[in-house]
Regions:
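Acidic (Asp/Glu)-rich catalytic clusters
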Residues: 7, 32-38, 54-68, 85-94, ...
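CE4/NodB-like, metal-dependent polysaccharide N-deacetylase domain
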Residues: 112-128
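A short alpha/beta connector and helix-capping loop motif
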Residues: 26-51
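Active-site gating loops and adjacent loop-to-helix segments of metal-dependent hydrolytic enzymes
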Residues: 79-109
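Active-site beta-loop-alpha junctions enriched in small/polar residues
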Residues: 20-22, 47-49, 72-76
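Boundary/entry segment of secreted carbohydrate-active catalytic domains
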Residues: 3-26, 32
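Structural preference for beta-strand elements that scaffold enzyme active sites
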Residues: 14-16, 41-45, 66-72
Length: 128
């Protein structure tokens, strides 16, 4: 079997491999950047609500031509960018289970969710 036959029988597959949670911690950021540099991942999603985001974003800038970079929308378990004090006395976004129950009961605070999403997007854009 020659190369022409192989390529016709098994055309190359374009695959995107995304490393999630960039920015959640410096260690995760180091690992994802290493994978991007090695060509092992082709994309990453960034947690702009993380307290490490701004610093980690600066480290990612030189790699922007090597991978697709997107926003990881964070709605659970992290410190919010919007004021959730009326819905979360702990100072954190609700747990996944709590958010799920809020959705089932029709109790999602839509205005607050919109504000959180807007702030996360603004933080993401501001870093680049």
């Amino acid at each position: 079997m020659n190369n022409d036959e192989i390529s016709q029988e098994n055309p190359p597959v374009h695959m995107i491999l995304c490393a999630d949670d960039y920015g959640i911690s410096p260690a995760v950021g180091d690992g994802i950047r290493s994978l991007i540099e090695a060509g092992r991942v082709t994309a990453t999603s960034c947690m702009s609500a993380s307290p490490f985001w701004r610093e980690e974003a600066a480290f990612l800038l030189p790699l922007m031509d090597l991978a697709d970079i997107g926003l990881h929308i964070t709605l659970t378990d992290q410190v919010p960018l919007a004021d959730w004090s009326s819905h979360s006395p702990s100072g954190k976004l609700p747990s996944q289970k709590e958010l799920w129950w809020m959705a089932i009961r029709g109790q999602l605070p839509e205005v607050l969710l919109t504000e959180e999403l807007d702030r996360q997007l603004d933080e993401f854009i501001a870093a680049f």
